[in-house]
Each structure stands twice: as C-alpha cells, then as structure tokens.
C-alpha cells in the first residue's frame, strides 16, 4: 500500500491507497519540529483503527512546502516503514515540463496539482489552490506548468485583519448569513469583506488571465477552503478536493513504471 504525505504550511495530510482506491485520509496540524517518533505515535493509532500495521505500507511519496520538515518525514518512512520515499523536488520524476524562468522555485504542491488536474480536465487550465496562500497556476494543454499568481490566503487575511486592528475580533470565515454585500455590524462587515473580497479576487484574476492568454480556459479549484466559494461564483468550473492526492498517486505510478523499465 502507498502512504502519500502532502504537507502544506497549515495542515499535513496522510492518505493510504490500496492499489485500487484511497481507503483512509487523516490530517494533522503542520509543525516543522515534529519528529519521526512523534509522527509514528499518532499515525500508528490511526492505522490500527483501519486494521492496518506498519508492514502494510510498502511505498511512500512526500510533497512538502516546509523544507525543514522533510528530514523528519523521510525518517518516518525509512525507520518505521522500511521504505525509501519519493520526495517531490528531490528524487521524484514528475514528468512535467516546467516552463518558467526559475524552475527550481516552483512549489512542490503547485506541480503536483498540475499533474492531478491535467489527468482529468481539458487544458489549458487555471488551477486555484486555496490554502495558507491562494495560488492561481497555469497548466498548458500538454500538461506543462507555465507559472501563476500567488496571493495571501483567506485565513491569513482574516488573521492579519484581527491582529493589526485592535478593535476587530477574531471571527470564523463564512459567507455572510444574510447574503448581503454590505454588513450591518462589525462581524458581518468583516465576513463580507473577506468572503466577497476573495470572490472578487478570484473573478478578477481569472478574467485577467483569460484576457492575457486570449483563449478559453477551464478553471479548477482545490484546497482547504475552496468549498466555501461553491455556489458563490460562476468563474470556477470545477471544485476538486482530491486534486493533490490524485497528482501524488500519478507521480508515484510514473516513477514506479520507470523503475521497472
């Protein structure tokens, strides 16, 4: 079975694929100092709940945007599963043509998303990933990664609003309950500013990208808060929560195929 680890700045996802389907997915808060021993204490309990032991894992792939965590995740795979992991950006061959000025700067998560999106949707594509940062990435019709846009994430914006303005409370991010744009109290005004502000960001950047490239493009959204925008904009064609793990599975398949040639 394959253990796929996808680590963002906020959360780390662990997923198990049995060769046919994903049978388990778990999330933990990303902590860059968490050791392999700490990971395995947590993970062993979850594996046990699925009726699985360490020996069931015979492959591992890691994608992380937190460089200081990769050492411990690699040790987790080596020490406890006796598996040399594929690591995006190190020893994993992605099969993606990276057409940007500095290919080494392309984030692992963005390249994995490009692979996952190209497998399912007709290109060219705009892939929006709503996480700690909100990224808009361009995937050509042939699957190449052609750059994109990086903006602050919605949670980061809300946090900055609270921390920088003494009288503004910390609130949950949600669509304003009354459905209106203009808030009538502080909380609804903040919710409207962040929620509809991000809708405007999405709609504006998607329109500008399409105009600059002068071609029809399919827009796919993924990430932790992407579902929040469902039904609020016509600029997104597909919401796909499995985009990243689909990309990881395909990259693992490509590398396994290369090893057997």
Curated annotation (Swiss-Prot):
InterPro entries: ATPase_NBD, Type_III_PanK
Record-annotated active site: 109 (proton acceptor)
Cofactor: NH4(+); K(+)
Cofactor: binding comment: A monovalent cation. Ammonium or potassium.
Chain sites annotated for binding substrate: 107-110, 186
Highest taxon, organism lineage: Bacteria
Assembly behavior: Homodimer.
Function, as annotated: Catalyzes the phosphorylation of pantothenate (Pan), the first step in CoA biosynthesis.
Name of this protein: Type III pantothenate kinase
Organism: Caulobacter sp. (strain K31)
């Amino acid at each position: 079975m394959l253990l796929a680890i996808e680590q963002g700045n906020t959360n780390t996802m662990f997923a198990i694929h049995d060769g046919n389907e994903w049978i388990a997915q778990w999330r933990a808060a990303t902590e860059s100092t968490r050791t392999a021993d700490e990971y395995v204490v947590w993970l062993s309990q979850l594996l046990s709940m699925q009726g699985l032991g360490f020996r069931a894992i015979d492959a591992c792939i890691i994608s992380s945007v937190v460089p200081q965590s990769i050492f411990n995740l690699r040790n987790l795979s080596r020490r406890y599963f006796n598996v040399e992991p594929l690591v995006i950006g190190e020893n994993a061959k992605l099969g993606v043509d990276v057409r940007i000025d500095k290919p080494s700067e392309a984030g692992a998560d963005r390249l994995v998303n490009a692979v996952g999106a190209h497998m399912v949707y007709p290109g060219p594509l705009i892939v929006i990933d709503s996480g700690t940062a909100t990224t808009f990435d361009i995937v050509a019709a042939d699957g190449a990664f052609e750059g994109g846009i990086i903006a602050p994430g919605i949670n980061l914006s809300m946090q900055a609003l609270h921390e920088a303005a003494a009288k503004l409370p910390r609130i949950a991010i949600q669509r304003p309950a009354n459905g209106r744009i203009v808030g009538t109290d502080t909380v609804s005004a903040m919710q409207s500013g962040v929620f509809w502000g991000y809708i405007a960001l999405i709609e504006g950047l998607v329109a500008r990208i399409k105009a600059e490239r002068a071609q029809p493009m399919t827009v796919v959204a993924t990430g932790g808060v992407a579902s929040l925008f469902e039904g609020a904009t016509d600029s997104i064609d597909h919401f796909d929560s499995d985009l990243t793990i689909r990309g990881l599975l395909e990259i693992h398949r490509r590398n396994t195929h290369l090893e057997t040639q």
